[in-house]
Amino acid sequence: MFGQIAPTEFDLRFSVFGIPVRVHPLFWLVAALMGSNTLSNPDLGAPYLFVWIACVFFSILIHELGHALTAKYFGWPPEIMLYYMGGVAMFRPGVGFTTSRSILISFAGPAAGFMLFGVVIAAWFGLKNAGVVLHPLVDDAFRKLVYINLIWGLVNLLPVLPLDGGRICESVCTSLRPRDGELWALRIGMIVAGGVALLFLSLSAMYPGFLFGYLCFSNFQMYQAYKGRGSW
């Protein structure tokens, strides 16, 4: 997404369906910081923070598996990395790479998250309707999985590079305007990311506000690199 992230001796490595997965240690730190408000709540505490981290890890892994498995289906061996900005499924497009396949791979991540959302909410309400009394931590895990996969799935479809919505926007723009489609995708990304950053900051949602502020700046930098100068 933003260049290669150097491996460390503390990386967690494993594979899923033959797809290599690497988890950078900063992934855990950022996930913990995002859920640190649980520590200030006397009714919650450390166990609920661990539930949050586990739900973030599982949700992002499923999301990236959506991308990776689709790329693998088309014959392009993928690998997954989870790091401080979330996750990324990497692969080298080969013969047969088309705009429609690019869009399909980009959408497969959010689609996997939405499918997980559907399974989790169906299981959660099914258990409750059956009269099953869930342990508070289990109930909290269901709640967090629903929240993460719905909200992150929707946010990730915003047309801001390098989010999946930005990739889809870029594919559409370059298909319609081969000469300057990347520039139009970056223009759209700057405007949307800037607006979303201001919205989150106005709601005192600092982490997503700063994240989209960073994405706005990143799109601006890429735009300048394409143009050679900052003019529109």
Question: Model-found features: residue ranges?
Answer:
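Hydrophobic transmembrane alpha-helices and their immediate loop junctions
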Residues: 1-232
